[in-house]
């Protein structure tokens, strides 16, 4: 079948076509194997967990070790799922409120590239106060694009508009932080950061840019280990660490990375060298 999701026509099978028991039969695979060929060795080894299973795993680990692991949850295509009568927001909040771990203990971040559902989260969290540590994060896509809900509502506001000082001030009325695409902070020359972080911090928004990856293909030209096209998939930890450090120095409050082990090392090294916290 063919469906239009956020303005893009897609042909295939969709999650709403299956039951949970059917989805449980699927195995996870590397999303972009041409760019991360080493990861295909893990294909078909792991089932796709439900949110409840992830919470229960984190809670079990917390009770055993005392180590707290937060949950950073993105609501994917909320306008589309609302149109399918499969709204995500209330089931998500109900699931999080079900467990003492997510209700009272762990830090929770709720993020979306759309705006309307984040405002709904804000209203519900303010009204019910069931999730004591929940925060709301506005994600930013490419600058010329508009949030899918704005497109559906004929609202002519782009992500670039939302990234101005006034735009960030507006976002701060419903969100606790922002998750910008990396180029909002540095362009490919990596000469100096933009005013994005400064303007976000001025209205008390945390800044968590995405996505940090150590393969050459995802690094700026001056950070690659080898600039030859055939080395696009080469892992380049030195370049990735330089990139981490530049964003840390620019003042980010957190990062999204596909290599959490490398990211953790980079954070620890930066904090040790600068005797500070993030």
Residue ranges and their predicted role:
Residues 1-162, 166-167, 173-176, 180-187, ...:
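Metal-dependent phosphodiesterase/phospholipase catalytic core, i.e.
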Residues 81-82, 124, 128-278:
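C-terminal active-site rim and adjoining tail of enzyme catalytic domains
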């Amino acid at each position: 079948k063919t469906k239009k999701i956020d303005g893009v026509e897609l042909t295939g099978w969709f999650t709403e076509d299956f039951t949970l028991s059917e989805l449980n039969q699927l195995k996870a695979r590397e999303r972009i194997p041409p760019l991360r060929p080493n990861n295909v060795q893990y294909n078909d080894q792991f089932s796709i967990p439900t949110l409840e299973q992830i919470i229960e795993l984190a809670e079990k680990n917390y009770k055993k070790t005392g180590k707290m692991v937060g949950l950073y949850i993105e609501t994917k295509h909320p306008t589309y799922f609302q149109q399918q009568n499969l709204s995500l927001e209330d089931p998500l909040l109900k699931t999080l409120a079900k467990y003492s771990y997510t209700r009272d203990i762990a830090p929770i971040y709720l993020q979306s590239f759309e705006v309307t559902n984040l405002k709904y989260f804000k209203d519900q969290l303010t009204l019910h106060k069931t999730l004591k540590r929940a925060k709301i994060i506005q994600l930013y896509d490419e600058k010329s694009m508009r949030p899918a809900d704005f497109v559906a509502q004929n609202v002519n506001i782009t992500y670039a508009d939302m990234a101005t000082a006034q735009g960030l001030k507006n976002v701060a009325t419903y969100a606790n932080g922002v998750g910008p695409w990396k180029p909002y902070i540095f362009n490919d020359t990596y000469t100096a950061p933009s005013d994005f972080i400064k303007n976000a911090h001025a209205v008390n928004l945390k800044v968590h840019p995405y996505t940090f990856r150590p393969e050459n293909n995802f690094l700026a030209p001056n950070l690659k280990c080898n600039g030859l096209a055939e080395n696009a998939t080469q892992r380049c930890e030195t370049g990735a660490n330089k990139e981490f450090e530049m964003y840390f120095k620019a003042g980010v409050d957190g990062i999204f990375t596909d290599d959490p082990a490398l990211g953790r090392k980079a954070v620890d090294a930066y904090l040790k060298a600068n005797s500070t916290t993030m």
